[in-house]
């Protein structure tokens, strides 16, 4: 689109508009019908062609065939449930595990009240929110990686 929308600076009408101080909104082609009827379908069809081409040239396998007589030793949830699964697996009391999971959104709801978020948009000028984000990300990654390991190595990730 950058090539098709490039203004012709040799055009005397455009030069006159620019000399009067009229900005970039006063030149170029209108979005309707040019973009919506000509450029966007080309982009959409090109994207679909790339996806179909990749699917034909490099098909991904669906997975292992299901065998009802061979149960895996440990059934793991989907990857986005790994931290929650790890909490429930390591905490001995299930009620405590559920309370730990509920405390995460409750703690995140208190962050705006701990500091004035509307005052600054720079994350370095909001140390509480930045610290909560960094520690939460590190804990989620730690728990997620630990969920894929055996229970005896899950909390230390086999490092200690």
From Swiss-Prot:
HAMAP family tied to this protein: Cytb6_f_subIV (MF_01344)
**To which protein family does this belong?**
Belongs to the cytochrome b family. PetD subfamily.
Q: Is Membrane found in the keyword set?
A: yes
Under Gene3D superfamilies, the record lists: plastocyanin oxidoreductase, Single helix bin
The subcellular location is: Plastid, Chloroplast thylakoid membrane
Any one GO MF term held by the record is: electron transporter, transferring electrons within cytochrome b6/f complex of photosystem II activity
The entry's function note states:
Component of the cytochrome b6-f complex, which mediates electron transfer between photosystem II (PSII) and photosystem I (PSI), cyclic electron flow around PSI, and state transitions.
GO CC aspect terms: chloroplast thylakoid membrane
What CDD domains would the database entry show?
cytochrome_b_C
Indicate the transmembrane segments per the record: 36-56, 95-115, 131-151
Subunit relationships: The 4 large subunits of the cytochrome b6-f complex are cytochrome b6, subunit IV (17 kDa polypeptide, petD), cytochrome f and the Rieske protein, while the 4 small subunits are petG, petL, petM and petN. The complex functions as a dimer.
**What keyword terms does UniProt attach to this protein?**
Chloroplast, Electron transport, Membrane, Photosynthesis, Plastid, Thylakoid, Transmembrane, Transmembrane helix, Transport
Entries under InterPro entries matching the protein: Cyt_b/b6_C (IPR005798), Cyt_b/b6_C_sf (IPR036150), Cyt_b6/f_cplx_suIV (IPR005870), Cytochrome_b_C_euk/bac (IPR048260)
Name the UniProt record assigns to this protein: Cytochrome b6-f complex subunit 4
């Amino acid at each position: 689109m950058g090539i098709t929308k490039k203004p012709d600076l040799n055009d005397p009408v455009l030069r006159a508009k620019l000399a009067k101080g009229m900005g970039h909104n006063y030149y170029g082609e209108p979005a309707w019908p040019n973009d919506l009827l000509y450029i966007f379908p080309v982009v959409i069809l090109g994207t679909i062609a790339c996806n179909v081409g990749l699917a034909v040239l490099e098909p991904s396998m669906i997975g292992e065939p299901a065998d009802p007589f061979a149960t895996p030793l440990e059934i793991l949830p989907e990857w986005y449930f790994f931290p929650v699964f790890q909490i429930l697996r390591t905490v001995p009391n299930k009620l405590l595990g559920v309370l730990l999971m509920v405390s995460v959104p409750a703690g995140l709801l208190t962050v705006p009240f701990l500091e004035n978020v509307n005052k600054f948009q720079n994350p370095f000028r909001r140390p509480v929110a930045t610290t909560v984000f960094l520690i939460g990300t590190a804990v989620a990654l730690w728990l997620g990686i630990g969920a894929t390991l055996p229970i005896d190595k899950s909390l230390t990730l086999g490092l200690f």
